[in-house]
A protein has these predicted regions:
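Residue-level recognition of hydrophobic positions within alpha-helical transmembrane segments
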Residues: 13-14, 35-38, 50
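DNA major-groove recognition helix of helix-turn-helix/homeodomain DNA-binding modules
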Residues: 32, 46-64
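Short alpha-helical DNA-recognition segment
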Residues: 21-39
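A short, Lys/Arg-rich alpha-helix, primarily the initiator
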Residues: 1-19, 57
Length: 64
């Protein structure tokens, strides 16, 4: 898997979570953040750091 070089868009964050079949709270737990942090990433209020994105993809196998 090639490492991403730009933060994911809010739509990508939501699509990856939904593809993994997770709620926002459960997705946050996967990468050790609270529900509100995940909500901010999906709403576009804040950008998801690449380290969290890569960790989420690895742990949910979304990076294949």
């Amino acid at each position: 898997m090639k490492s991403p070089t730009v933060p994911p868009t809010p739509a990508q964050v939501r699509a990856a979570r939904e593809a993994a079949g997770l709620t926002q709270g459960a997705a946050g737990a996967v990468v050790h953040v609270d529900l509100r942090s995940w909500q901010r990433w999906e709403s576009g209020e804040r950008s998801m750091h690449l380290a969290y994105w890569e960790l989420f993809l690895i742990k949910t196998r979304g990076g294949k």
